[in-house]
Amino acid sequence: MKTLALKGLDQSKVELVVQTPNPDPISWANTIRKFNGIGSDIIITYGAPVTLAAIREVDNIPIVFVDVYGPVEAGVTRSMAAPGRNLTGVSSKVPMITLIKAANDIKHIKSLGILYNGREIGSVIQLKEIRRLAAQMGFSVVELNVSSANMLDSALGTLTSSGVDFIYAAESTLVTRSLEKVILRARDHGIPVISHIPEAADKGALVTLEINTYEQGQLAGECVSAILQGKKQGQIPVATPKKVDLVINLKAAKLLDLNVPIQVLNISTKIVK
């Protein structure tokens, strides 16, 4: 809203209707239909699953997405330069190798556990990227597909007893909502958590590499403003935030009895103490 207000589109001219659906396809579809029913001029979606639901449900309302990891790979857009369809938005993709190398410099990775949701395309893309890095760097992966809340405890039990050196928490609605539980269970077994989930380090993860959420909001606001001023959404290039934070949690490192090398601290942009 701040970005829109700076462009002369404050709350006296723009009505914002916010919905927080349950993390399942039926709830996502019902929410999009509700927006369609009230005559929304633009629909803003958060994450690939909701965005894909919006694409299926509407073809006459512009969609602006945020926090989609790899919009092209996810099947959300045709390209970054010309997304096509009736949408544009903001990508949240960051280099997986930067995160994995930082973790490996703190503690050598022989085995990496992965919590992901096979029903969410962004989570699957991250899984595939880690598989490629594992083949290149020579570590093994233990993959746990967590697609419902009642699967989480079992998955955590498997990972914490499998001898993994780290747990990677892939982006998914379920894992994000349960992140503090994941981190605490892992810590009880001396296992650090790494992730791309925003603010994961503030919740206790050891290392995160994340897009700046404030900048994402600014870029989304610029997309909305351009559409309201008449620009075709499918011709607006997908934006990628320039600010990427490598966050190191020294408090978590101390609790896990790990030393963070100076070369990792030197490349970090934020340190949690």
Language-model-detected regions and their locations in the chain:
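Short hydrophobic alpha-helices and adjacent helix-cap/hinge residues
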Residues: M1-K273
